[in-house]
């Protein structure tokens, strides 16, 4: 248990450093592409690290994370810090917008398709209405949830996620059952 907690502390310290870098990068958001430090990264390992960091947070909500990291070719040329922040942000949103009356179920999956790495992060949260779904990646856009969720923010998280994915020549989309 101590080793797990110490690993989480180490990961969180690293992530905090990444967050500071993210804030600095966001200041350049409109001006140009983010400065990416590209290198070969095993996406399965990176995602496993984020899942490990998130495990305690999810357990606090009686939740569980299921991972199927099935990508046979998980190595990509990417910026480790920004990709970590993208995965963290998406998983963090799943926790923030969970249904109050249900235990959180978070499913993370990787696979290869047509020579590309695919990543899916799925949850059983409150969902997003169709009319809001197409706007969630816009800068400063926030879906109004009334007083149901005490979630603070500026509507930058998913805009950052989209920017980083696009700067990596990738695509991102969101789906909801609402």
Give residue spans per PLM region:
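Short alpha-helical segment of the dimerization/phosphotransfer core of two-component systems
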Residues: 11-16
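Short helix-loop "hinge" at the ATP-lid/N-box region of the Bergerat-fold HATPase_c
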Residues: 94-95
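Short conserved segment of the HATPase_c
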Residues: 128-140
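Short beta-strand/loop element within the Bergerat-fold HATPase_c
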Residues: 103-115
């Amino acid at each position: 248990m101590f080793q797990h907690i110490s690993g989480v502390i180490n990961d969180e310290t690293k992530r905090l450093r990444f967050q500071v870098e993210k804030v600095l990068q966001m200041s350049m958001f409109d001006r140009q592409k983010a400065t990416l430090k590209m290198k070969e990264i095993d996406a399965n390992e990176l995602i496993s690290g984020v899942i490990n960091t998130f495990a305690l947070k999810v357990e606090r909500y009686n939740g569980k994370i299921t991972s199927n990291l099935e990508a046979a070719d998980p190595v990509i040329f990417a910026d480790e810090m920004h990709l970590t922040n993208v995965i963290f942000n998406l998983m963090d949103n799943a926790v923030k917008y969970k249904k109050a009356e249900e235990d959180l179920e978070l499913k993370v999956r990787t696979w290869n398709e047509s020579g590309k790495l695919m990543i899916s992060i799925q949850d059983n949260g409150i969902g997003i209405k169709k009319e809001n779904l197409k706007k969630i990646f816009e800068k400063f856009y926030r879906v109004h949830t009334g007083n149901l969720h005490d979630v603070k923010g500026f509507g930058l998280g998913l805009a950052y996620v989209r920017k980083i994915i696009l700067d990596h020549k990738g695509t991102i989309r969101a789906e909801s059952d609402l």
